[in-house]
C-alpha cells in the first residue's frame, strides 16, 4: 500500500476478524492462497471514471460497503450469520474487477460484467460453501450476482447490502465533484445535475 494507506489494511484485517462462522472461513483464507489476486485487490481502482476511480479505490469501496452492510445488519437485528454474509458480500462483491489484471495481466481498469467474473474467482470457496450450507450459498450468490429487481427470491439482508453499495458510490462521487473546489463551496454542477453539500464549519 502507498504512503499513509496502512489504516486501510487495519480496517480490512478488523473486518476479517468479524467473520466467525466456520462455513465462511474459506473466504478469509482465500486471500492467503491467492496472493496475486490480493495484490490486485489492494491497488486497483473501483471504476474507470466513476466512483473510487483511483489507486486503492477498489479496496476503499469494498471496505466501505462491508462496514456499512455489517453495521446496518447488526443494528437492524439480523442473525449473526446473515450479518457475516453481508460483510463477506461487501468485501467480495466487486472482486471480478481484478480479473483482467490478476488473470490476464492487463493493467488499468477494464469495463465489463464484473459480477459474472466474481464467480470465476470465487469458484472454490463458493463450491465448499454450497456443500456445507446450500441456503447460505444461495444467499451470498444472490448478493454477488448482478442486481435483478424481479428475481423470484428476495432477501432483506441483500437490500441492506445493495444500499451500502449505493451509498458508498454516491458519497465518493460527491467527494470527487468537490475535490478541486474551495472549502466554502456549497454547490456545484456535475453534468446536468446540481450537487449540494454543507461544508465543514
Predicted regions mapped to residue ranges:
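Divalent-cation-assisted or electrostatically stabilized phosphate/pyrophosphate-binding catalytic cores
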Residues: 10-17, 104-123, 183-200
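Catalytic-loop motifs flanking and including active-site residues across diverse enzymes
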Residues: 61, 87, 114-118, 156-159
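An amphipathic alpha-helix signature
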Residues: 66, 85, 115-119, 123, ...
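Acidic/His-rich, divalent-metal-binding segments that scaffold phosphate/diphosphate chemistry
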Residues: 1-107
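Histidine/acidic-rich helix-loop-helix segments that form or flank divalent-metal centers
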Residues: 87, 100, 104-107, 129-185
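Alpha-helix termini
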Residues: 74-78, 127-132
Amino acid at each position: 500500500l502507498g504512503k499513509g494507506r496502512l489504516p486501510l489494511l487495519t480496517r480490512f484485517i478488523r473486518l476479517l476478524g468479524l467473520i466467525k462462522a466456520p462455513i465462511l472461513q474459506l473466504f478469509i483464507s482465500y486471500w492467503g492462497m491467492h496472493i496475486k489476486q490480493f495484490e490486485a485487490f489492494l491497488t486497483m481502482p473501483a471504476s474507470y471514471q466513476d466512483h473510487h476511480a483511483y489507486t486503492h479505490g477498489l479496496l476503499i469501496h469494498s471496505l466501505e460497503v462491508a462496514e456499512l452492510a455489517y453495521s446496518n445488519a447488526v443494528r437492524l437485528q439480523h442473525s449473526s450469520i446473515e450479518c457475516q454474509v453481508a460483510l463477506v458480500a461487501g468485501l467480495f462483491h466487486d472482486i471480478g474487477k481484478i480479473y483482467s489484471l490478476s488473470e490476464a495481466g492487463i493493467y488499468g481498469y477494464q469495463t465489463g460484467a464484473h459480477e459474472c467474473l466474481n464467480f470465476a474467482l470465487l469458484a472454490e470457496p463458493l463450491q465448499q460453501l454450497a456443500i456445507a450450507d446450500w441456503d447460505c450459498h444461495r444467499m451470498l450468490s444472490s448478493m454477488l450476482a448482478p442486481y435483478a429487481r424481479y428475481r423470484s427470491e428476495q432477501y432483506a439482508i441483500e437490500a441492506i447490502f445493495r444500499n451500502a453499495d449505493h451509498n458508498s458510490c454516491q458519497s465518493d462521487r460527491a467527494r470527487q465533484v468537490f475535490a478541486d473546489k474551495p472549502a466554502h463551496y456549497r454547490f456545484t454542477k456535475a453534468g446536468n445535475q446540481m450537487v449540494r453539500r454543507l461544508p465543514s464549519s
